[in-house]
């Protein structure tokens, strides 16, 4: 919501929130000004903060959880996806590559390789799937703490953005709330890395929610980790059966009435130790990730299902007979909520055509993974009846990310990296995961230099931005050559839809 500042003293202000026609006033502490305030300390926000600070800007990063890293740490999804191709080559460089290599050196991550003579490897759930970076969620949080301190980024944890103040189409302050009350954070540039377009919503930028017809979103998950798993027994069975999701076994259990869930897949990823496995099987339907009531239902249902799953795994699945619950994620894994409705929108048709964009700031190598809101085991853009993005080699396709997808309307100094970008909904599949979110965040952090110097977000000199991204090793040009191109309609023109002003030489 947009907040009205009523009065201002030397150290405190009175702010007024409008709700249901009533005004409610609260004292708010005035904070020192920053060039950039980044809202959200997940992958996009962390990369944005680092990049902006390295661009010489004074940066404040606020995060609602107790640690940085977002879904990778608090969400328990110990897997940075989408940043390497199926041969293990880098598709996303810059901060993502730097953090991955540093985490590997600090024993906080593993960069998987396909074992000789094998079709599957234990760090994934698809054949030849090695492009993820497997993490220790606790240690990677420690790595992120250190990186922020080294870069000189100011961090506030357990702090949530709850509103903004605007002057015309400029955000002047971000209003936050934490244990010590409300604060007014002055900023020249605001980066909305909340994943939910919270700041865009507060700033009255147009946003969309879920599917166009019913506004339902793809299912959420509550990830959990098991210990004391016989990994060899599990991976040997997957290699033998070629069924990493155990669909035939699940069908048998359904017939017996011993699989009580609406999803019929099993997803496991080996952890950093031989006996640890991340379980990302749950598909919690009808969860609104922007509603406290709905999220509460998701947590309660998720914790219940975690222990139901554990009992079934111990009884029927190879390798799990002696497994123990190690942890259940303290944060719900939400895949989709709001998206900004920008002047430019990346569409499925753009990608079918193989459209080349003059403002591509990075790529994703992840698949078209966006489960149906009502049929949680169905992937509309992957199944045969879907969007035609399946190829015979079953290799992943490169998806380009134009700068313009991060530019909202009605606000000149706001950028929105991450899953809340301006795209046709189905395009979220390859772009919502963590490595491409880091690519987007890094581009926003670098673009913030121009915006802090007076440029509007839609008037950023993209030529200069791309030069700097390449200088920092963020854009991996080799990634622009996908292993398999999408099917191209020969009647399509492949033109670039330049709805937002982009400066190009």
Which residue stretches match the model-derived regions?
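Conserved N-terminal/central alpha/beta ligand/cofactor-binding core
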Residues: 51, 57-58, 64-163, 167, ...
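Bacterial N-terminal signal peptides that target proteins for export
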Residues: 1-7
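Hydrophobic helical h-region of N-terminal Sec-dependent signal peptides
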Residues: 10-12
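N-terminal Rossmann-fold NAD(P) dinucleotide-binding loop
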Residues: 45
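Conserved hydrophobic helix-helix packing surfaces used for dimerization/oligomerization
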Residues: 36-38, 59, 414
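Flavin (FAD/FMN)-binding glycine-rich loop and adjacent Rossmann-like elements that form
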Residues: 27-30, 73, 114, 118, ...
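Beta1/beta-strand and adjacent pyrophosphate-binding region of the FAD-binding site
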Residues: 30-42
